[in-house]
Structures are given as structure tokens and as C-alpha cells.
Amino acid sequence: MKDYKNELKVKINLGEHLRLSIPGLVKKIMYKTHYLEIQVEKEKMLTVLKYLKEASKYQCNMLLDIVCVDCLNIEEIKIGRFKLIYVLNSIYNNTRVHLSTYVENNGIIETTSGLFESSVWLEREIWDMFGIYFEKHPDLRRILTDYGFVGYPLKKDFPITGYLEVYYDVNDKKIIYKPIELMQEYRNYNFGAVWGDYERKVYLENIIK
């Protein structure tokens, strides 16, 4: 069995040491069961990442992922439209560190590709899906969507249907792009509602009448 109390002690020790080692750079530290989350301003992200990678006490030599969260319609929108989470792994400490920051809509943040080669593709994915621009990136172009794609499909305000219909025309033997044509007006469904609520309501209203 895992010794979670000991793991938490390690995380607290690392967090407090970081706060004292680079004063003024760390905005907030949160201690989770399986990882340590450190929140910083986006302008200080690269400095803190470099320290976590190179300092002998941390040795966060692996960037496993960069996660982007669209904060539209949730409380964190007050801090920034997007939350970026850099998932680091320290084999030396047998722990994961999440370094997080916030970026505005169509915001700019400096690339981390100079520190971690794995971030080259990860940052391209975030640029393609969310529209966050990574300054000084060696090859920032779309990686998942089609050529000439308009918009950023994982933003919450991007229409589910998209803007264009793309298909291969067998007769013309070419790919066709045309505007989306809906046979009925688009509807927003309440996925939180229990199935049959509306029918039960109508049934009860008819009984009352």
C-alpha cells in the first residue's frame, strides 16, 4: 500500500522549499493527493519551469503534458479565460508537479520548447484547439485541423456544428467545402435534466385540467 501521509509530507516539503527559494515568483501552492500544484503568473512561468528542472532538489526533467482548460462559464474566468497546466514528473522525488497559470482569450505566452522538446507538439495542439499563441515557438502551425480551418474548436463558444461541411465528391473527385446547412433550427439541450421530465409535466398538467 502507498504511504499517502509520507507522500504529502514530501509535497509540503517541496512546496515550502520552493516558496523560500524563489520568493515573489510563486503565487499559490496547493497540495493534492497525487501531485503538487504551483500557480504562477504567465510572465514568470519560464523562470519557475527552468528552476524546477535544474534545481537538484526537484529535478523535474519530464514534461508529460500541457493541459488547457477553457474557464468560460466557471468561477476561474475572473482570473483568466484559459488555465494552462504544465504536468511535470520528478523521478528523483517520485512525484508529479503541476505548474499552472492563466491566459486571456487570444493571449500570448512564451514557449517552453527551449526547456522541453516534448512541448513543441503539445503547444501546437493548444494553439490549434484554443488559439493561445506561444511566442518564439520554432514551428507554430495547426496540427490537428484541416488547412484553412477557421476558429478554435475546443473553445466553449465555438459552435458544435462548426462552420463548414467537408466531404469528398466522388463525381468531381475532389474535396468539397461548403457552409453548414441545418434542416432545423439548432437547439440547446439541457443534458442535466432527467429523461421524461417534460412528458411527466405535461401528463400532470392534463390531469389537473
UniProtKB/Swiss-Prot annotation:
GO terms for cellular component: mitochondrial inner membrane; respiratory chain complex I. Its EC number is 7.1.1.2. SUPFAM superfamilies: Nqo5-like. The keyword Cell cycle does not apply. PROSITE patterns: COMPLEX1_30K. InterPro entries: NADH_DH_suC (IPR010218), NADH_quin_OxRdtase_su_C/D-like (IPR037232), NADH_UbQ_OxRdtase_30kDa_su (IPR001268), NADH_UbQ_OxRdtase_CS (IPR020396). Its main location: mitochondrion. Core subunit of the mitochondrial membrane respiratory chain NADH dehydrogenase (Complex I) that is believed to belong to the minimal assembly required for catalysis. Complex I functions in the transfer of electrons from NADH to the respiratory chain. The immediate electron acceptor for the enzyme is believed to be ubiquinone. This is NADH-ubiquinone oxidoreductase subunit 9. It comes from Dictyostelium discoideum. The gene is nad9.
